[in-house]
């Protein structure tokens, strides 16, 4: 599952969670697998995995920012531990999580601790999940959506590009 964010003029993705949940991602069906990622903070809140903008996707971790996309960190000393950091960039950036095929309930928390933000989220770099979600400086909103993940292999042979 790949999450794509574009900034117009400012995008911040904060506490992206994935549990077969991305921010938090959970499968909408099947065995529950949960990932809770916190972006941009100095220290992760309890139960979250800290993700720095420098963390590149690897098969070993199963998650990270895709090559060629390096957001920057925004931090604030105000607010609770979960809302003290964010990642942002003037260009789109991609964060991927390796998950098996299935339907996933994904919750993202969007906002920026210091500036107004406008965020667009796409799944697998193409499917629009959230468009131009605007948040005021220091304000955060959570949104939940379902992502259907399918591999390129077809069970009867062949492959989808």
Task: Outline where the language-model segments fall.
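Bacterial N-terminal signal peptides that target proteins for export
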Residues: 1-12
């Amino acid at each position: 599952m790949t999450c794509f964010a574009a900034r117009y003029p400012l995008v911040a993705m904060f506490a992206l969670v994935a549990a077969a949940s991305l921010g938090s991602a959970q499968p909408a069906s099947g065995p529950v697998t949960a990932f809770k990622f916190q972006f941009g903070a100095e220290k992760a809140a309890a139960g979250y995995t800290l993700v720095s903008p420098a963390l590149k996707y690897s098969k070993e971790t199963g998650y990270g920012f895709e090559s060629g996309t390096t957001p920057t960190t925004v931090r604030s000393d105000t607010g609770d531990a979960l809302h003290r950091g964010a990642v942002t960039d003037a260009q789109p950036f991609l964060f991927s999580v390796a998950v098996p095929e299935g339907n996933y309930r994904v919750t993202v928390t969007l906002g920026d601790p210091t500036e107004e933000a406008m965020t667009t989220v796409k799944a697998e770099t193409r499917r629009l999940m959230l468009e131009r979600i605007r948040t005021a400086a220091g304000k955060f909103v959570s949104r939940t959506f379902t992502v259907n993940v399918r591999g390129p292999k077809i069970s009867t042979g062949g492959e989808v590009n």
